Amino acid sequence: GYATPKELMDDMDQALSLIPGKHKINLHASYAIFEDGEFADRDALEPRHFRKWVEYAKERNMGIDFNPTFFSHEKAAEFTLSSPDEEIRQFWIRHGQACIRISQYFAEELGQSCVMNIWIPDGYKDIPADRLGPRARFKDSLDQILSIPYDRSKVYVCLESKVFGISLESYTVGSSEFCLNYAAKNGIISLMDNGHYHPTEVVSDKISSLLLFNEKIALHVTRPVRWDSDHVVLFDDEIKEIAKEIVRNDALDRVFLATDYFDASINRISAWVVGIRNLQKALLFALLQPNETLKNLQDRSNYSELMVMQEELKFYPFADVWKEFCRQSSVPGGSEWFEQVRAYEKAVLWKRK
């Protein structure tokens, strides 16, 4: 953890100095910054509690995306937006509404849209007696959150599903079917996290279906190891397939991309830099593919030639293009960036209490 918000901001600056391209900050509501002696509970958060984040973003010409935090709170011990306890459910509804207002504040202050993603950890460890009731309450809670006036051209509300989690082995309220149907019916955005599905399912296969029926979709890019473990994103086959699906379907302006991972066993800055650079590498790799040629081979049933081409392309010199992109962005192209992290660790991180 961090002793102060400034420590977090300093580390973000260090990471951003090593990652090429343009980025947005993705904040959780739990990162509110209070003045000395001040506190507001989750249902009473206001834009002013995020003013310092807006100042930080403005100085760096960045936007901010946002997430209500429906966990790590005494009122999230069991259920949140699907709670049978009406007092607790209304508390979390007010939190969601507060976050929409904060998201619009971000969009208006920073001059770019804010993507606000809703995910709740509600579910049952063992076989439930009522599957419909919690989902009906969740549906009503979302209806109430979305009932407040907000500018849908500035705030893009997303809904994220999950197959199961620790202590939710038997039933997750916000399942894929629930979230896809709710988003489609209510004109909000479906968000897919590639760690939130059964291990035999891949998000790369789901993107094309969603693009056919939605103007915009959203992704949390992570790396699941046997379950939703949120390992650091690697330049692996599935990340490349996800990037290819976005690029070859001409959907770069229709897919909101965020990374969602953390590994507390390694240096935080290294984790940020490795994971984000790998997602960028995957997008570059996809942009360099002869996508029309490959599609024509598939349509003409030339499967042998298609396989040969796909395999040969893995050895094409895409790393040269990556290094040029890094050079133009004034960041290290290869692993030499790690020396800067090591120096920062010695000069700054080790001196923190």
What is each residue range found by the language model?
Residues 113-123, 127:
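Aromatic- and glycine-enriched pocket-lining scaffold segments that form the walls
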Residues 83-85, 208-209:
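Short, hinge-like loop/turn segments at secondary-structure boundaries
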Residues 1-84, 91, 100-102, 108, ...:
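Alpha/beta catalytic barrel-like cores
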Residues 106, 125-238:
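Acidic/histidine-rich catalytic cores of soluble enzymes
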